[in-house]
Amino acid sequence: MTPTPHTAFPLATYRLQMHRGFTFADATRTVPYLQGLGITDCYLSPISKAAPGSDHGYDVIDPVVLNPELGNEQEFEEFVRTVRAHGMGLVLDVVPNHMGIGKTLNRWWRDVLENGPSSRYATAFDIDWHPIKRELENKVLLPILADQYGAILESQEMELVYEDSAFVLRYYDHHLPLSPKSWTHILSHRLEQLVTEGEQAMPVMELQSILTALKNLPGTGERNPERIAEHYREKEIVKKRLSTLMDESPMIRAFVMENVRIFNGERGRSESFDLLDALLNEQAYRLASWKVASEEINYRRFFDINELAAIRMEDEAVFLESHQLLLQFVRQGIVRGCRIDHVDGLYDPVRYLHHLRELTTPPDGSQAPLCIVVEKILGKD
């Protein structure tokens, strides 16, 4: 797509705050009015997928897709066409410093919680996997509880559930993944009784085979790339096998769901929560009250906001994946400027900006350089 000729540089921008109450379709309707004001460029607040209901968009949960609350790709393309037809340009707000991780809706963060240091996205976040507190070795602290862990556990405010072919821990709006290797705790409970009753029926043998496969999965502390790839491949196969088995065998489904009930304990019987406690101790995260965040948290945040985790933009793979959408728009000639949010929070702001300039400047000079502005003014030292 060839951009409509306009001024060589954004001379007058008008910021449009995008949210579910002001979408791409709404923005499209404002373009003629903005042109009449002499505006050269529409400047959009973040348009990547943000936390549901976000009214600002800076809590991005997936940087590589458009925010569905703002509209679909066709509606965005119509907005772009309208901007071009009126001889105007487009400037985007970019958020490289942090991501929204609240309610485990961020797929990168969710992957880290499920797979720990062996997660494909473990290097995306600034997590101290070896903090002074030994209980947090190879774990990330999750200060999401409204009270002390023991009180929440025994009040049954969090519960084990089986949903979408996986075991998860549900705590109000949080749906926390459980390491597939730890599923052996759930599936092996009362197994001898099932074997006796099932008389080695094929469904029981399949469950035993699934248990063997789970036990052989590489652990969450695995660092060998080949073993990590094996972990990702095999865990998905095992998930599918268990889901199929539960769909086809009422006996196995009843067995598993009864174990889920048992693991959730009985209020008033402290010892009945030992099974769930042991299961949670096997995870790559440690649940805690929000009150301990300032003292024990081991991941870098945006200021002191627990729901905004800092990103390691100095990692090349993280940089490329998180800027996928922006780089695509630049190549297509859709965007000619960007405003970088909180650049001073990055590990190396200058290096980041130089790298962004390199990747957005065509070597053949076919396009004008991307206009890059930053939110913060950095001191000369």
Q: Where are each of the predicted segments found?
A:
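Catalytic domains of carbohydrate-active enzymes, especially glycoside hydrolases
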Residues: 27-51, 75, 325-337
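Alpha-amylase-like alpha-glycosidases and glucanotransferases acting on alpha-linked glucans and related
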Residues: 3-11, 15-21, 53-59, 64-91, ...
